């Protein structure tokens, strides 16, 4: 997270799970084996024990000694510096994860600077019950089924290979937006932006961010042009009324 902030990333995606003693932590894997060598799952251990595990050396020796941070630590670090995409990864072993995540979002006044996403629609429903104003996104690995009208999903985050122009159109018709993941090549980003995708999730912000900025700048110019045309055609009507 410190590296992402140093590179000026305006938005950061993270995954949230929970330890045995109810601490919300930021980690992708439920199993601790890949990142730490520990055979336990994250929900099996109290945070004091999880914090002692080296979660950085597997990636690169320069990160030796890095530990799995709490969600609270990440919120404190990123507050005022970056928006967050908080993916909740629920488990039958962690029934209070949604409530704890929302509590921390409120504690750090992060509601307007984050979105909460999940592959579990039930999780999104719980979040909306706790705070209807939090923006929620439904993560879909397959772009099939009738999901466009799900009330607890403000937007959809879809695996990029399943996105079609028709899907984008249906989502936009309902006043919702669509994000694509995970886009690391310029040509893939260009194709998705042409389809009308609203946002891209990437591991390569230095490649993708300029394309998104350019696309949004074009949208702003088109909106300005639309307003100018509307004013032009409205002017004669106003004169006739006089």
Regions found by a protein language model. Give the residues of each.
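Phosphate-group recognition and catalysis centered on beta-loop-alpha active-site segments
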Residues: 1-242
């Amino acid at each position: 997270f410190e590296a992402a902030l140093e590179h000026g990333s305006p938005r950061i995606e993270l995954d949230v799970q929970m330890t045995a003693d109810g601490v919300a932590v930021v980690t992708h894997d439920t199993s601790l084996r890949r990142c730490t060598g520990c055979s336990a799952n994250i929900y099996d251990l109290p945070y004091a024990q999880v914090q002692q595990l080296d979660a950085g050396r597997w990636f690169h020796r320069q990160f030796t000694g890095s530990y799995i941070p709490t969600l609270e630590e990440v919120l404190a670090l990123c507050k005022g510096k970056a928006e967050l995409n908080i993916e909740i990864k629920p488990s039958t072993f962690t029934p209070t994860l949604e409530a704890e995540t929302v509590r921390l979002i409120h504690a750090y006044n992060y509601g307007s600077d984050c979105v909460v996403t999940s592959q579990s629609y039930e999780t999104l429903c719980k979040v909306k019950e706790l705070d209807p104003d939090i923006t929620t996104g439904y993560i879909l690995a397959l772009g099939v089924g009738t999901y466009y009208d799900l009330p607890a999903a403000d937007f959809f985050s879809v695996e990029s290979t399943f996105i079609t122009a028709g899907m984008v159109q249906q989502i936009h018709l309902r006043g919702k937006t669509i994000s694509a993941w995970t886009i690391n090549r310029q040509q893939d980003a260009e194709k998705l932006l042409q389809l009308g995708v609203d946002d891209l999730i990437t591991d390569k912000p230095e490649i993708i961010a300029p394309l998104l900025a350019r696309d949004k700048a074009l949208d702003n110019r088109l909106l300005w042009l639309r307003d100018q045309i509307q004013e032009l055609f409205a002017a004669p009507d106003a004169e006739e009324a006089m």
